[in-house]
Design a protein with these regions (language model features):
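Short, well-ordered alpha-helical microsegments
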Residues: 9, 70-73, 144-148
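Structural alpha-beta junctions
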Residues: 19-20, 124-126, 130, 156-160
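N-terminal active-site wall of soluble small-molecule enzyme domains
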Residues: 1-55, 146
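A C-terminal functional module that forms or caps the active site or interfaces directly
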Residues: 141-167
Length: 167
């Protein structure tokens, strides 16, 4: 929806902020390190535009795609710590074809298990007083058996659990 969609999104974010709601923006962002850093600043941090510091997208949390590895995720983790924000990394998604890639085996482990190990590692540096960290995982409700395995791998990560209702 282009600029019109952006405007509506920002109005919705402003309204949610006024109501004191926690805002998760489902953007599934990531790229190579330098571009990931720019995405992270735009969604979680602050940017300088002609000497004026602003927060372009005042949300609490975004979803990210972990499949570019640590150099693509680290800028988001850094900004989580700096700006008291959070991320949810795609681990085992709820869509029917998720298994085409996420269920593939690497040795004796599924790719989603390997990704969960990365999420657990990235989360370690953000663990707060609650015992949980700022790096959570998207784990589909459509795969409850896998979710049990993933909880054991990521005991200190929040789970964002999509998959109830229409997919």
């Amino acid at each position: 929806y282009g600029l019109c969609g952006e405007e509506v999104m920002h109005r919705t974010i402003s309204y949610a902020k006024e109501k004191g709601l926690y805002i998760i923006l489902d953007v599934k962002r990531n790229d190579i390190g330098s571009t990931a850093e720019a995405y992270s600043k735009a969604y979680l941090g602050k940017v300088d535009i002609d000497g004026v510091e602003c927060e372009p997208c005042p949300v609490d949390c975004v979803t990210v795609n972990p499949y570019l590895g640590t150099d693509g995720i680290q800028p988001f983790v850094n900004d989580c710590k700096t700006f008291d924000k959070a991320i949810f990394a795609l681990v085992k998604t709820s869509n029917p074809s998720s298994g085409e890639l996420q269920d593939l085996l690497v040795g004796d482990e599924h790719i989603y298990e390997k990704v969960a190990q990365c999420v657990n590692k990235w989360n370690e540096e953000t663990i707060g007083k609650s015992g949980y960290g700022a790096v959570g995982a998207v784990v589909g409700a459509t795969y409850p058996e896998q979710a049990k395995v993933l909880r054991k791998i990521m005991p200190k990560s929040y789970f964002l659990v999509p998959g109830y209702g229409a997919q």
